[in-house]
Swiss-Prot record:
UniProt family annotation: Belongs to the 'GDXG' lipolytic enzyme family.
Active-site residues (renumbered): 165, 262, 292
Assembly and interaction partners: Homodimer. Interacts with MalT and MelA.
Protein name listed in UniProt: Acetyl esterase
Signal peptide: none
HAMAP family, alphabetized: Acetyl_esterase (MF_01958)
This protein's UniProt keywords: Cytoplasm, Hydrolase, Serine esterase
A Gene Ontology term for the protein's cellular component: cytoplasm
Encoding gene, per UniProt annotation: aes
PROSITE patterns: LIPASE_GDXG_SER (PS01174)
Enzyme Commission number, as recorded: 3.1.1.-
Span of the annotated motif Involved in the stabilization of the negatively charged intermediate by the formation of the oxyanion hole: 91-93
Main location: cytoplasm
Task of the protein: Displays esterase activity towards short chain fatty esters (acyl chain length of up to 8 carbons). Able to hydrolyze triacetylglycerol (triacetin) and tributyrylglycerol (tributyrin), but not trioleylglycerol (triolein) or cholesterol oleate. Negatively regulates MalT activity by antagonizing maltotriose binding. Inhibits MelA galactosidase activity.
Amino acid sequence: MKPENKIPVLTRLSDEMKAVVNFQQPGLPPWPADGDIETQRQYYLLERRFWNADAPSMTTRTCAVPTPYGDVTTRLYSPQPTSQATLYYLHGGGFILGNLDTHDRIMRLLARYTGCTVIGIDYSLSPQARYPQAIEETVAVCSYFSQHADEYSLNVEKIGFAGDSAGAMLALASALWLRDKHIRCGNVIAILLWYGLYGLQDSVSRRLFGGAWDGLTREDLDMYEKAYLRNEDDRESPWYCLFNNDLTRDVPPCFIASAEFDPLIDDSRLLHQTLQAHQQPCEYKMYPGTLHAFLHYSRMMTIADDALQDGARFFMARMKTPR
């Protein structure tokens, strides 16, 4: 689709979203478009420092968890001494960017709003690590904490997964992996998904939206996919194209959040419609006037904070519901 035919989303954003788009961090250099992947990772970390400031204080603990691929760093956020459940968080970044620091504020707010321990998983990034390594690392982390719950004062009878963007795919894929492989490391009571991609190769929203402002042009999406997958056959894997998995049974309750002007919004819509058609518990909410990745900007956007609180409420409600 010619770029000129796309919807001019920058004129339709909410005032809060426009303020973020137009905000210039003092002293921040331009995005290193021609830099190597490590340079871009360092820039992303630097750029996110402002957005992670002024986050709630709480007890945190770092733990290196053994996995088949080597140790994976995790960070435990404990808002109170005891927790009714444990929520595992997978950060976004197109599978190639991001770490526990780039999403620190999001995890702190989730811990605060749920009152539960949140465990951030610093899974290995692509292209150095390819599918399904990040999923298998996540499953290994869950199994480890299931076996060492007392040591970390965790309640792993009830667990959940959460993630944004690529992390949302990893969150849902990990939960389905546990189900499909019959791995028990707690009762998955909910999955919180913010503007994820779930396997569509094309869609109306991918044609209408996406540009330099969000890093989600067709070329960008192709690049992320090629970095993550081992080969083209992986595109049809049921833990990458999640619509090729069985979504008709035993899917944990899903909170599905989308951004109005996100090229990936049709992934969320289709996931919701599929689960709803097969009586799988789910809730869908679209946040008007927003772009992909808006969850990061809660320092300037009340709707970002609202989206986190909505997910937290969904999770807390499932803590009280027998399943």
